[in-house]
Amino acid sequence: MSKIIGIDLGTTNSCVAVLEGGEVKVIPNPEGNRTTPSVVAFKNGERLVGEVAKRQAITNPNTIISIKRHMGTDYKVEIEGKQYTPQEISAIILQYLKSYAEDYLGEPVTRAVITVPAYFNDAQRQATKDAGRIAGLEVERIINEPTAAALAYGLDKEEDQTILVYDLGGGTFDVSILELGDGVFEVKATAGDNHLGGDDFDQVIIDYLVNQFKQEHGIDLSKDKMALQRLKDAAEKAKKELSGVTQTQISLPFISANENGPLHLEMTLTRAKFEELSAHLVERTMGPVRQALQDAGLTPADIDKVILVGGSTRIPAVQEAIKRELGKEPHKGVNPDEVVAIGAAIQGGVIAGEVKDVVLLDVTPLSLGIETMGGVFTKLIERNTTIPTSKSQVFTTAADNQTTVDIHVLQGERPMAADNKSLGRFQLTGIPPAPRGVPQIEVTFDIDANGIVHVRAKDLGTNKEQSITIKSSSGLSEEEIQRMIKEAEENAEADRKRKEAAELRNEADQLIFMTDKTLKEVEGKVSADEIKKAQDAKEALKAALEKNDIDDIRKKKDALQEAVQQLSIKLYEQAAKQAQSAGSQGGAANHKDNVVDAEFEEVNDDK
């Protein structure tokens, strides 16, 4: 059975880990880095993922970044005349992570635990699960990122403690409060903001640079796509540098031009200025911190440890704000970029039975309910309820002789249905005609361990039942998922062939170089006939490379290899013959008794 890998599918970066021999290993990508940019690009029909995609983002408009922000929506991105859903783009990233995990483990990988922000709603969780399926992974569990981080932090901790996980990623923000003790990880409360992260901190720097440049030169760089991508890269770099130094130089030569010639952007950005620009973002993260404490019925003094997750928590102003709010230094013992994937791999170990005595009790981040008369949102399951859970409530009809009930399922905290996230609708039909208020309709909500919702409605009079697994308007049908799985497999096969072809071309080029070298060495040592045969084979391979016919390249490469081998054999045979004749001559010389007298002089050491 395949190992279960742990995947942190992030907005800006992703990470994959696995439990091996009781120890979690973060798997490096082919470039040797332990995290991979969540970037996908399309270029001449080829798909690029990770570092290579990010590197060419400036010049390639068909580059997709931060797709996680659109999970669970009906957003589509059009590339080269084809529309892609966020699930498909995420699946391309997952496929890449899966492929290098397989290279590392030396075996196929088909099972995974994938993390999501704690504040993801049902549609976003379902979309993540679908992305995993499209990538050829059986998603064993969807686990909340802060919970995964707590699992990684607390696995070897003996004492009972209450921890707050502050997770500021590239595009999402979560806070979870957990109680740890005796192998039980119990989430007490969770809060967050799905549209707040490192990208927003980059954006304030970009806006500042655009404004400064506009004031100085009267040119709006935000209208220039290529300039904007350069600004984005520079802003991200400056943000990272300002975590270690108090000022940084931003230098972007030839960023634009006017009638007088090229224009360059040269600017010094201080940490103080960056903190001023991003102060409102840092303050926005404090709202969910206070909310989580309130929901858990705790005060800052009750928190034993604060765990920081996500690269953006390296920003000094963020750490200062946490210290001010909670009155304690954040714990620095975990790697904020890797801790979530490590936790996911541990959860994989729990599912596979490799990790014993660990119980994970997570919660639902948002309240669940249905729309009732007057457009009111009636909650059935309150937020921060431990999952898995099930809850039933009896409702009745709103009109006389009503034979159908339309059930509208929602998720959120607002009192009116229209202000909450609609998860889907379904109908219970065949209710016997009766005066309003008489029929008894029982609605049951189930939330599984992945935080995914299943709903049943039952007419208690007839025992007629209708059930659905919630499919939001942005969700994919089974046929769509199957089609995408098939396309993903075909693309993986095409990628494999493309890689094989590139390797074959490299081998052919290498062989041509070696042939030229060998031909120089054998000049005058083997027959002209043999040399011509090798030269012809070399020219034939060059011609095949020009035509780019893979089968022909393979054939001509084998033929040239054979010809070069024959040359080498002839060369060795000749060398062996020469050595033999030289050996026999040397032997004959030794038979002559020519003794040469050597003159010598005695040296007196006592001189």
Curated annotation (Swiss-Prot):
Upper lineage: Bacteria, Bacillati, Bacillota, Bacilli, Bacillales
Biased composition regions of type Low complexity, renumbered to the chain: 575-589
Cell inner membrane in keyword set: no
CDD domains (UniProt xref): ASKHA_NBD_HSP70_DnaK-like
Gene Ontology molecular function, alphabetical: ATP binding; ATP-dependent protein folding chaperone; unfolded protein binding
A Pfam family this chain is assigned to: HSP70
Domain of life assignment: Bacteria
Induction: By stress conditions e.g. heat shock.
Swiss-Prot/TrEMBL keywords: ATP-binding, Chaperone, Nucleotide-binding, Phosphoprotein, Stress response
Gene3D superfamilies recorded: 1.20.1270.10, 3.30.420.40, Actin, Chain A, domain 4, Substrate Binding Domain Of DNAk, Chain A, domain 1
Protein known as: Chaperone protein DnaK
This protein's encoding gene: dnaK
Stretches for region Disordered: 575-607
Phosphothreonine sites (modified residues): T172
Residues that span the membrane, as ranges: none
InterPro entries reported for this sequence: ATPase_NBD, Chaperone_DnaK, Heat_shock_70_CS, HSP70_C_sf, HSP70_peptide-bd_sf, Hsp_70_fam
Family, as annotated: Belongs to the heat shock protein 70 family.
Species, as recorded: Geobacillus kaustophilus (strain HTA426)
Acidic residues: compositionally biased ranges: 596-607
